[in-house]
């Protein structure tokens, strides 16, 4: 992936939820199974071109890093196997220098690799603090290789597009 200078203009929590359905949760002797789902969305912020400091050559994009972590425990003492569900949509507003000189693929790479790479540590901290405040050990998510994730999803999209041509 070639490097492009991205500028972040703001970052924020857009949506957040923590569920602790078995509170007070009786700790199990078994370690919980933790399932983490990650999704990334990008949206060009329409109408920003006429605002001060923003031009069509450098439009703003909102990148949303959506992480959901669900912990389950198989224990006969607990009627519902859900220990907790923590979900955060963490966003950033980005612009890319020399936007008009880049191919569509280069822009997608900058948005779907560079954006989430910047946002992830902040979302990770929110999840760790929240699970700790919920009475659990802090959930420290492993780092995510967003470049590999992007490449895998691009390959899947190409495969499904080529498969759709067969009758």
UniProtKB/Swiss-Prot annotation:
HAMAP family: SecB (MF_00821)
Species the sequence originates in: Wolbachia pipientis subsp. Culex pipiens (strain wPip)
Keyword Transport assigned: yes
Record SUPFAM superfamilies: SecB-like
Taxon lineage: Bacteria, Pseudomonadati, Pseudomonadota, Alphaproteobacteria, Rickettsiales
UniProt GO BP: protein folding; protein tetramerization; protein transport
Signal sequence annotation: none
Quaternary structure (record): Homotetramer, a dimer of dimers. One homotetramer interacts with 1 SecA dimer.
A molecular function GO annotation: unfolded protein binding
Protein name: Protein-export protein SecB
């Amino acid at each position: 992936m070639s490097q492009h200078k991205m500028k972040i203009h703001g970052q924020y929590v857009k949506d957040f939820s923590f569920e602790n359905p078995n509170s007070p949760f009786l700790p199990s002797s078994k370690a919980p199974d933790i399932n983490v789902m990650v999704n990334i969305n990008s949206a060009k912020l329409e109408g920003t071109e006429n605002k001060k400091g923003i031009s069509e050559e450098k439009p703003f994009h909102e990148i949303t890093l959506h992480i959901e972590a669900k912990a389950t425990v198989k224990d006969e003492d607990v009627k519902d196997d859900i220990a907790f569900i923590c979900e955060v949509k963490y966003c950033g507003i980005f612009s890319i220098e020399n936007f008009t000189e880049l191919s569509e693929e280069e822009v997608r790479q900058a948005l779907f690799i560079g954006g989430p790479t910047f946002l992830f540590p902040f979302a990770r901290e929110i999840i760790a603090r929240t699970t700790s405040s919920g009475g659990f050990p802090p959930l420290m998510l492993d780092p995510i290789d967003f470049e590999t994730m992007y490449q895998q999803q691009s390959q899947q999209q190409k495969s499904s597009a080529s498969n759709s041509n067969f009758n």
